[in-house]
Amino acid sequence: MNFNKAEFVRSYGEYSQLPPSDRLELAFAGRSNVGKSSLINKIFNRKNLARVSAVPGKTATINYYSLENIYLVDLPGYGYAKVAKSDKVRWSGLIFQLIDMRHPPTADDMQMINFLIESEIPFVIIFTKADKLSKRQREERMAGFAQEIPYFSDIEHVEFSAENGEGADKIRNIICELAESGNDDIG
């Protein structure tokens, strides 16, 4: 899979505007300013494919990116939680749940994780901004996440840095596995 050939498809302002789903869609969810757009740029090896802003909530649209036979979907903040159940099925291939590694999960993070567990939607947690912590701080936060997140030991997770690319290859491998297998649960 050639990640350099990913293309921005379109932004949608409302869920009702989404076209019928004709291929596997993998979604990126997380609070505003957690680094979803930066992650997309890093895994696609592009600096400006997804617009990045220091202002929280700047991504207010649902942004679609095409990568060969799949779509990657950048969801606005926690907008995914407000979608009708019928629309959630379209992103049931996998949700990448992004959490800022520097902080404990927010109430919204926990609500989303619990929703994904209860709905049996496969997901991977991506801990962003890993480069902002020392090795010791990272170990402490991972121990904290193990206490704070239910079933943590059973959930696939990736420590990621948009600055140095740590974790990007692992995320690409997950995407490739899903693209090859179609819609299988990897976690």
Report the location of each language-model feature.
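Short, glycine/charged-enriched secondary-structure capping and boundary segments
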Residues: 22-23, 41-43, 86-87, 110-114, ...
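Conserved G1/Walker A P-loop phosphate-binding module
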Residues: 1-80, 180-181, 185-187
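Conserved nucleotide-binding/hydrolysis micro-motifs of P-loop NTPases
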Residues: 58, 70, 77-80, 102-104, ...
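Conserved C-terminal guanine-recognition region of P-loop GTPase G domains, centered on the G4
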Residues: 88-155
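Low-complexity, flexible helical/coil segments
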Residues: 40-46, 66, 96-97, 131-136, ...
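Nucleotide-state-sensitive switch-loop elements of NTP-binding domains
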Residues: 78-89
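Short, flexible loop segments at the rims of nucleotide/cofactor-binding pockets, characterized by
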Residues: 49-51, 83-84, 100-104
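Canonical P-loop GTPase G-domain recognition
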Residues: 3-16, 132-187
